[in-house]
A protein has these predicted regions:
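N-terminal Rossmann-like FAD-binding beta1-loop-alpha1 element of flavoenzymes
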Residues: 2-28
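Flavin-dependent oxidoreductases
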Residues: 39, 45-86, 217-218, 231-280
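Structural detector for helix-capping/boundary residues
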Residues: 8, 13, 174, 226, ...
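Short phosphate-binding/catalytic loops that engage adenosine nucleotides
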Residues: 24-25, 166, 220, 276
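Helical element adjacent to the flavin cofactor pocket in flavoenzyme catalytic cores
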Residues: 152-164, 184-258, 262, 266
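Dinucleotide-binding Rossmann-like beta1-alpha1 core, especially the glycine-rich loop
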Residues: 44-174
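Glycine-rich FAD pyrophosphate-binding loop
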Residues: 21-41
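Conserved Rossmann-like nucleotide-cofactor binding loop
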Residues: 11, 34, 266
Length: 280
C-alpha cells in the first residue's frame, strides 16, 4: 500500500518505520524542517509503563473544579463561549466525566497498561534492530514523596500496577538513597517513594531524528516544510492529502491508499474537517 503519515514526531516516525518494515510505500509529511521539532522536541524523557493511571477517576471532578482557579493546575478546563463554537470541548468533558468511576477506571487502567507494555517491547525491538543511540538509561524510575498522605495513596497505586503485572513498589527513604544518592541532601524531608526497575528514560528527539533518517534510507519519502491544508475524501475514504510547500507556496494533492494522522493536538481539528470526531 501507498501510505501517507502526517506528523514526524515520535509517533508518526515510529509508525512510518513499522509500515516500511511491513513492506509498504511510505511518505512522511511535516511542516517543520526536520523530525521531532514540536511535541517530541523536549519532553519528560520517561519511558514509564508503571505510571499510566488515567486522569479520569472518581476524585477527578472535584479536583478539576478546584484547579479551574489555578494557572498552575495539572488539568485545566477553560470553557469556551459561545458553546456552539467549542462544542468539541464540552463533548470531551462529558466523555471524561463518564469515565470518572471505579468500573471505567479499572477497565482503562488494564487497557493503558497493556498498550504501554506492548509499546515498550516495540521500542526495545526497534533499538535492537537499528542500534540507535538516544541517551538511553535502563536504571528504572523513582518518585519521591514528602507528604505522608500522598505516600499512602502511592501505595494503593503501586498495588494497582502490580495487579496488572508492572513491578512498581514502595520503597523507604533509605532504599531511595541507595537507588539515588543525590537524594541525600534533602533526605530529612522524604517520607518514602516508589521505584520501578523496568522503567527507563531517553531523549525522544534524538531517537525520533535518527529513526526518521533510517526511514529515509529504507526508501521513505520525507516531505518536510510542507503544510497540510486539507484531507480530500471520496465517499467514506480519504484518497489524498492537500499540501502546500512553504518555500514556493505551490499546492499539490498527495494520493494515498491510507493516511495516518499523527499530528498531536492538531489531529482533532484536522479530522473534524472530514467528519471524524476524535476525543483529544
Amino acid at each position: 500500500m501507498n501510505i501517507v503519515v502526517l506528523g514526524a514526531g515520535i509517533i508518526g516516525v515510529s509508525t512510518a518505520w513499522h509500515l516500511l518494515q511491513a513492506g509498504h510505500e511510505v511518505t512522511l509529511v511535516d511542516r517543520q524542517s526536520e523530525a521531532a521539532q514540536e511535541t517530541s522536541f523536549a519532553n519528560a524523557a520517561q519511558i514509564s509503563v508503571s505510571y499510566c493511571e488515567p486522569w479520569a477517576n472518581k476524585d477527578a471532578p472535584l479536583k478539576a473544579l478546584k484547579w479551574m482557579f489555578s494557572d498552575e493546575a495539572p488539568l485545566l478546563f477553560r470553557p469556551q463561549f459561545p458553546i456552539g463554537k467549542g462544542w468539541h470541548q464540552y463533548r470531551w468533558g462529558l466523555q471524561f466525566l463518564a469515565n470518572c468511576n471505579d468500573t471505567a477506571f479499572e477497565r482503562n487502567v488494564a487497557q493503558i497498561v497493556a498498550l504501554g507494555r506492548y509499546s515498550h517491547e516495540a521500542l526495545k525491538n526497534v533499538v535492537a534492530q537499528t542500534g540507535i543511540e538516544y541517551q538511553r538509561l535502563e536504571k528504572g524510575i523513582a518518585h519521591i514523596f514528602t507528604d505522608e498522605r500522598a505516600f499512602a495513596a502511592a501505595g494503593d497505586a503501586a498495588e494497582l500496577m502490580r495487579r496488572h503485572g508492572v513491578d512498581r513498589k514502595l520503597v523507604s527513604t533509605q532504599e531511595l538513597l541507595r537507588i539515588e544518592p543525590a537524594f541525600q541532601r534533602f533526605a530529612s524531608r522524604i517520607v518514602g517513594g516508589t521505584y520501578t526497575a523496568s522503567d527507563e528514560s531517553g531523549d525522544a528527539r534524538e531517537f525520533t531524528c535518527q529513526l526518521a533518517q533510517r526511514c529515509g534510507q529504507l526508501g521513505a519519502r520525507l516531505l518536510f516544510n510542507h503544510d497540510v491544508i486539507g484531507l480530500n475524501k471520496v465517499g467514506n475514504t480519504i484518497d489524498s492529502v492537500a499540501l502546500r510547500a512553504q518555500k514556493t507556496g505551490q499546492t499539490s494533492a498527495l494520493s494515498a491508499d491510507a493516511v495516518v494522522i499523527a499530528c498531536g493536538s492538531y489531529s482533532a481539528p484536522l479530522l473534524r474537517t472530514v467528519g471524524v470526531n476524535l476525543p483529544v
